[in-house]
């Protein structure tokens, strides 16, 4: 009898065969081994049986990791082992987290840890969809109050046709990279980048992915049933309804009034004062029954319901706007003298200082993946310091949120960047959020577009971004343009759209409730289009196309072509020649096998100096031309004279003077500089020189 109680489920998901398995590996956790095509991911879920005392939030942690052995590789670095999570791993962790988090009920505070490990990969496709499906299956058998399962799908668009779960080869031809996740009845999460696609094309991709994932959801349900998954016995905590009614009677009107204060810090101060008043009124001095915690919860719930009721009843939003109005905008470019490109983009109380820096190919980011090492010529780094929201905090490396927001902003800009052969600079954008009250990632998109044009980067089109929100109760709903931080926190959807006047370049959607219909998504997309066009119009008043020249402080780029046979002369023995040129001119030089030479100089003069040295090395000797040469060796029958780097010719004794000489050393000595004329170059490349009738300096 086997020591393993293995449960398997196989199903076809688009072009890939999927196998779910449990009971063989990591049996002390709720574990699923999922194989999808050539990718295998081990997903382990561990849930604490009870919440920690005093816990007032849901501690869900998702860690996605790629083991290098999965692709038959040994990690780099001194220790030769996997280190901290890469940016790609962090982004995939967020991708898994976002659709499962809203499916746990309010009040469930038991700690849950999800670990998804890629253990095998044929390097033909991403492992994220397999990891998401594996997580869904592991949660389905974990006995937690998870209202799943979820399905997930990647959607591409090739030649106008949607493609389900495309591989790397197909993605290279696709105009769209969209990941959608959801339940049987609703879409929960969308993450995408696109090449300026229409709203209809994007909505169609979301609906296509949701329809196709139903087979995965059905298979996971059948898998969980076969594994004997038991329903959770967790019961939601009851709340003091009498206290809720008293709080509402005493504070609903006051909270509603506080939410008419437009300035965020003043509004927060007023709400904090009301909360303190509620605590003083309803919490006894000796709080043995935990009334303080109940007041905290019910007060937050009252704030939530008050703002939502105001919006749905048609009242002005927190800052006095209607549902479609974008906050006041201020657009400035060229705000930093030495930066290659800079912009200060302000939208209400959200502000981003965005810079563009241009570098040479050696500044490219080296990215280590399961498929191997690749170079990335475009970087966008997003920073969210504590001071941007008027708080103190410890400065550290980028957190998951910053990495995620930076990637979203990058997606919004990438589609409009020029091709590398047209603009071969490495581009680094940094967005420093200096103020924040909602939609800082979309402010980063706007600022990035502005700073790129200020730097002289020839964009295909300017881009802008806007964050949309939703409040929905029953059949009533309101879509909000350009949401505040409070509206994001108190709303049901965070819907971010970036794009140009021609179409969408990035779409991100996170939905906290079920029941978001096609109609609501269509309304949100169309309303976002109107908002995006308004923002673009305001940006275009300041700058609408790239400056004609790059910044005088940016490196100068030049391209020349040399004879491929001369490449080794430019490089020199052991790289000595090219290294000397680089050190002398401070220019970076890249040479391709076809003879294309790219020169990046810190200044235009540096680039020109490097090119002059390269051309001197690679120049072809011209018969009849006079050269400045140096005697490098004297022999009995003449002298060898260097006329160009790496090029020597023979000056025969009979060609040294118009008069007959007996000894070469009577006229010449080694190291002497002379003017010589090329008489002839034979078919073997040997050069004959003369000094006759050539006036010497």
UniProtKB/Swiss-Prot annotation:
GO cellular component annotations of the record: cytosol
List of residues binding Mg(2+): 488, 494
Top enzyme category: transferase
EC number of the protein: 2.7.7.8
Listed NCBIfam families: polynuc_phos (TIGR03591), PRK11824.1 (NF008805)
Similarity remark: Belongs to the polyribonucleotide nucleotidyltransferase family.
Protein name: Polyribonucleotide nucleotidyltransferase
Gene: pnp
């Amino acid at each position: 009898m086997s020591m393993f109680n293995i449960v398997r489920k196989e199903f076809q998901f688009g072009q890939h065969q999927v196998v779910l398995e449990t009971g063989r590996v990591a049996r002390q956790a709720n574990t699923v081994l999922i194989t999808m095509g050539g990718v295998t991911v081990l997903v382990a879920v561990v849930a604490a049986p009870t919440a920690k005392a005093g816990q007032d939030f849901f501690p869900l942690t998702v860690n996605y990791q790629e083991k290098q052995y999965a692709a038959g590789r040994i990690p780099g670095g001194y220790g030769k082992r996997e280190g901290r999570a890469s940016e790609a791993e962090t982004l995939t962790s967020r991708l898994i987290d976002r659709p499962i988090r809203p499916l746990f009920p309010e009040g469930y505070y038991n700690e849950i840890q999800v670990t998804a490990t890629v253990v095998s990969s044929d390097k033909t496709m991403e492992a994220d969809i397999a990891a998401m499906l594996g997580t869904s299956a592991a949660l389905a058998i974990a006995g937690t109050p998870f209202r799943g399962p979820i399905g997930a799908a990647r959607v591409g668009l090739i030649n106008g046709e949607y493609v389900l779960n495309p591989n790397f080869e197909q993605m290279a031809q696709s105009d769209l990279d969209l990941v959608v996740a959801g339940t049987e009845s609703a879409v929960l999460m969308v993450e995408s980048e696109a090449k300026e696609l229409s709203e209809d094309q994007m909505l169609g991709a979301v609906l296509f992915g949701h329809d196709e994932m139903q087979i995965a959801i059905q298979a996971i349900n059948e898998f969980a049933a076969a594994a004997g998954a038991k329903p959770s016995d967790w019961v939601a905590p009851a709340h003091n309804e009498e206290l809720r009614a008293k709080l509402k009677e005493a504070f609903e009107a006051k909270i509603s009034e506080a939410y008419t204060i437009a300035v965020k810090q003043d509004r927060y101060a007023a709400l904090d004062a009301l909360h303190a008043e509620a605590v003083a009124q309803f919490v006894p001095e000796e709080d043995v029954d935990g009334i303080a915690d109940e007041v905290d919860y019910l007060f937050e719930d009252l704030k939530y319901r008050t703002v939502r009721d105001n919006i749905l009843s048609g009242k002005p939003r927190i800052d006095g706007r209607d549902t479609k109005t974008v906050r006041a905008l201020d657009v400035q470019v060229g705000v930093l003298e030495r930066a290659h490109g800079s912009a200060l983009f302000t939208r209400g109380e959200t502000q981003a200082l965005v810079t563009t820096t241009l570098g040479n190919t050696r500044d490219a980011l080296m990215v280590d993946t399961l498929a191997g090492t690749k170079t990335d010529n475009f970087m966008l780094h997003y920073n969210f310091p504590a001071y941007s929201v008027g708080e103190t905090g410890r400065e550290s490396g980028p957190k998951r949120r910053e990495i995620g927001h930076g990637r979203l902003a990058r997606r919004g800009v990438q589609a409009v960047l020029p091709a590398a052969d047209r603009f071969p600079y490495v581009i680094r954008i940094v967005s420093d959020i200096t103020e924040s009250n909602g939609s800082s990632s979309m402010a980063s998109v706007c600022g990035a577009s502005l700073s790129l044009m200020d730097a002289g980067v020839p964009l295909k089109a300017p881009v802008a971004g806007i964050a949309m929100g939703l409040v929905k109760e029953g059949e009533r709903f309101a879509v909000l343009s350009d949401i505040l931080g409070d509206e994001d926190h108190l709303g049901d959807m965070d819907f971010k759209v970036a794009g140009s006047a021609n179409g969408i370049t990035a779409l991100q959607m996170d939905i906290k409730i079920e029941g978001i219909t096609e109609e609501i998504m269509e309304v949100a997309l169309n309303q976002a289009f109107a908002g995006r066009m308004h923002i673009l119009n305001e940006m275009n008043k300041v700058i609408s196309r790239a400056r004609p020249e790059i910044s005088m402080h940016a490196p100068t780029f030049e391209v020349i072509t040399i004879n491929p046979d001369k490449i080794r002369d430019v490089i020199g023995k052991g790289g000595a020649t090219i290294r000397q040129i680089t050190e002398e001119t401070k220019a970076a030089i890249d040479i391709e096998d076809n003879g294309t030479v790219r020169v990046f100089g810190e200044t235009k003069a540096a680039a020109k100096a490097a090119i002059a040295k390269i051309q001197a090395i690679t120049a072809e000797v011209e018969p009849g031309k006079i050269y400045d040469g140096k005697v490098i060796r004297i022999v009995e029958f003449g002298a060898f004279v260097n006329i160009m780097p790496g090029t020597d010719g023979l000056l025969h004794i009979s060609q040294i003077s118009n008069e007959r000489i007996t000894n070469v050393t009577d006229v010449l000595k080694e190291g002497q500089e002379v003017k010589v004329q090329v008489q002839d170059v034979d078919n073997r490349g040997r050069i004959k020189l003369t000094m006759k009738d050539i006036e010497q300096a």
